[in-house]
Amino acid sequence: MALTSLGAADGVAAQIESAIRAAVPDARVQVKAGGAGHYEVSVVSEVFRDKSMVQQHQLVYRAITPLMTGAAAPVHAMDRLLTQAP
């Protein structure tokens, strides 16, 4: 059973990474599953240069909003979001 959960978490992590890369094509993205729909994400992109942390986070959250919306949303929370320019 734990393997199924891990596989599902890995699939969602891949969806998160894909959604972020679609919105921020040059991004280096790392996603870590924390369990029960919780994730930690790190994103490095030139797009973030000269943007405030709030603006950087807004770009990422906009990209993953579909994964956080609805009763059966696979992403419950972003426990940690790190964004920075290279």
Write out the residue ranges for each language-model feature:
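Solvent-exposed beta-strand sheet faces enriched in polar/charged residues
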Residues: 30-32, 42-44, 82-84
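A short interface-forming secondary-structure element
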Residues: 42-57
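N-terminal presequence-like segments and adjacent domain-start helices
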Residues: 1-13
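Short secondary-structure junctions
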Residues: 20-28, 70-75
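Short edge beta-strands and adjacent turn/loop segments
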Residues: 22-40
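C-terminal structural segments of small proteins and small subunits
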Residues: 61-86
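Short amphipathic alpha-helix segments
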Residues: 13-20
